[in-house]
Amino acid sequence: MSDLVIPSEVQRLAAQAVRHTTPCGAGDLVWHVWGQARPGVRPLVLLHGGSGSWTHWVRNLDALVAAGHQLWVPDLPGFGDSAAPLSGGDADAMVAPLREGLQMLLGNAPCDLVGFSFGGMTAGLLLAAHPELAERLVLVGPRPWAWCPTGSSS
């Protein structure tokens, strides 16, 4: 496959997904689900980077489903097909609608959580406030300098 993601690939994956919605702001938080739930295997939740949507994960979805994961991939609040949160568009504003959505969709069962870039910061904030939501956290392409005090270079 070339480095470019072709629209037909996105269309194929979108058609295979099961779509769920949970409340967010004045509308919905949209969740895309691939794969089947399996006993003893936690759902894998993928949070995309900023200015994106579930399509940030296009190249990973087939392999993760083939490996036996059930994937829950939201369009973060204010991105993709999801409504903006009422409290703004920064990572802090993502925590409440994501927590509510995860509890509505997965109940009290913990997931494994993967966050890419802005989604990594969001995942960290989510689990700092609600550590019971996930057993594992994976950060992909995090920005460690974002947490350095002003004027610090490392």
Give, region by region, the residue ranges found by the protein language model:
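Active-site loop/oxyanion-hole signature of alpha/beta-hydrolase fold enzymes
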Residues: 13-14, 18, 22-26, 32-34, ...
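Conserved catalytic-core motifs of eukaryotic protein kinase domains, centered on the activation segment
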Residues: 56-58, 82-88, 149-151
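Gly/Ala-rich beta-loop-alpha elbow adjacent to hydrolase catalytic centers
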Residues: 115, 119, 123
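Conserved HGGG/HGGXW glycine-rich cap/lid loop of the alpha/beta-hydrolase fold
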Residues: 30-81
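Structural signature of beta-strand start/N-cap positions in the alpha/beta core
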Residues: 43, 70, 110-112, 133-136
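Catalytic nucleophile serine of serine hydrolases
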Residues: 82, 117, 141
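Flexible "cap/lid" loop of the alpha/beta hydrolase fold
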Residues: 124, 128, 134-154
